[in-house]
Every structure is written in C-alpha cells, then in structure tokens.
C-alpha cells in the first residue's frame, strides 16, 4: 500500500457506561480538529466484522477503546506496534472486543493488516450502569486520551488544525452533552415523582 490512509477508530457502546470511552474520544477528535483528507475518524461502536473494510484499507490504524487489563480504574495507556497483540489477549468486557480481535486477525490472515497500529486504552471504572454514560474517572481522562491520540498521530507525522466550529461525529442526540442532559432531566423527574 503506497498511499497513506489513517483510520482513527473509537470502539465501544455509548449506552454502557465506560464501555463507550473509545467512541467519546473519537467524538472529541472529530469535533475539535480538521484533519487531512487521508485521515478518517470513525465511530466503530460495536460493529465487529463490519469494520474489516476500514481496517484493511488503512496504512495506519489508531484504536481508541476501554480495555480491562486489570489495572487501577481510570488508568490510561498507549500501546503501539508489537505491543498490540496484548490488546488481543486482554480480558474481554463485551462482544465488540471479541469481534474486533477477529477483525484484526482476519485482516492479518488476508495480508491487509495496517503497517502501523496503535491503541489508546482506558481501564474502565464502571460497566454495570447500562444506559449510563461515562463514570467520573473515565470522563476526567477524556482530555488526556485526546492528547495521547494526538501524540501518537504526530509520531506518524499527522498534525490536525484546530476546528473553529463545533462538529458532531454521531447523531446530535448521542453527543455526551445531550445524552447526559436528557438522562439527568429524566432522573430528576423520576425523583420528583417518587418524592
């Protein structure tokens, strides 16, 4: 592959507490910066094998995800190159990680694994709040994860320009601000009805 094509992929389920961390980081990268046309920011969500095309077309792949490495909750790590197989053997928290491991393995078998792969991962603090957003620990790590992703991309020679306007990677109703706002209003209404 002679042309550079960079895929920055946020993985996880937005509706399952810290499981959505990777997608939230991808949203920030999309919202805050303008990228060269050969860089694509992707909400990979929990799409599994549907992500194979993105992976196989990339020369550089940056994965953003919540990963259970058994570390202190809220710990942020960046792994690159030969350290990526550790991602494949980490404790799986959800089906998307099993299927994304399969995506990477299949791309490798087919001879289309990106030449450069890195991962920015967070040890989750909370996963038992289905329908909930990020825990406070995970939310506090969003700026650091954004900076870690930017540092990895800069190591690959990719430096974006700051965006002057706000942009949404997903549907506006799924943005963290809107999702949290609706959830908080619903919670308060429920509390008022009960009390």
From Swiss-Prot:
Q: Which UniProt keywords apply?
A: Aspartyl protease, Hydrolase, Metal-binding, Nickel, Protease
- Its Enzyme Commission number? 3.4.23.-
Gene3D superfamilies (alphabetical): HybD-like (3.40.50.1450)
Pfam families the UniProt entry points to: HycI
In this chain, Ni(2+) is annotated as bound at 19, 65, 96
Question: Its Gene Ontology biological processes?
Answer: protein processing
User: Which molecular-function annotation in GO is an example for this chain?
Assistant: endopeptidase activity
Spell out where the chain crosses the membrane. none
Matches recorded under InterPro entries: Pept_A31_hyd_express (IPR004419), Pept_HybD-like_dom_sf (IPR023430), Peptidase_A31 (IPR000671)
Keyword Protease recorded:
yes
Tell me if Hydrolase is a UniProt keyword of this record. Answer: yes
What does the function comment of this entry state? Protease involved in the C-terminal processing of HyaB, the large subunit of hydrogenase 1.
Q: Which family does it belong to?
A: Belongs to the peptidase A31 family.
Name this protein carries in UniProt: Hydrogenase 1 maturation protease
Organism of origin is Escherichia coli (strain K12)
Q: What is the lineage of its organism?
A: Bacteria, Pseudomonadati, Pseudomonadota, Gammaproteobacteria, Enterobacterales
